[in-house]
Amino acid sequence: KEVLSDKTTMHHLIEVDPVLSRVSVHLANFLEIPFDVYPKDAIMPLPLEEADVVIGDFPIGYYPVDERSKEMKLGFDEGHSYSHYLLIEQAINALKGAGYAFLVVPSNIFTGDKVKQLEKFITTETEMQAFLNLPPTLFKNEKARKSILILQKKKAEVTKPVEVFLANIPDFKNPQQFQGFITELNQWMDTNHTKK
């Protein structure tokens, strides 16, 4: 729990891997940021209040607990469901209305034979804000490349559709290109998220 002026911030971490959970606790202690750590499967029902922001870096693969995936909108009718689809749904379910999700996902997430189900969920439940491809130099190959997907949970009379910000984040070693990207992002923010 952290107090920022008149707001209290709670940090929660959900990690199924016990080693990564312990590393996260040590990192939080080092940074002096208090975290509640839940060493559990993030696709199972969560014991948390709705959040203003969810940040996630999702594993790619199949989720083996078919009983749980069948309870979810992004679960497949047959066979194992994609864990990254289920984690997107879980992230949105964990948000308050108008809350934001910042999710690291495979860059090719909007391709494949099951993508219509994901697209329907995103358009029904959220306002997509941005899809930012991370620099290719961060990954061994194009197949491993990831992107940042930014979604806002819909809330009647609060959220509104925006022009989705699509961009390739330039290599961090090129300051001029990176500054150009930041300028573009700021312009998009000014146009689509003006303070009232």
What kind of feature is each model-predicted range?
Residues P59-Y62, N108-F110, L138, K155-A156, ...:
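Conserved nucleotide-binding/hydrolysis micro-motifs of P-loop NTPases
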Residues H80-L138:
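Conserved Class I SAM-dependent methyltransferase catalytic core
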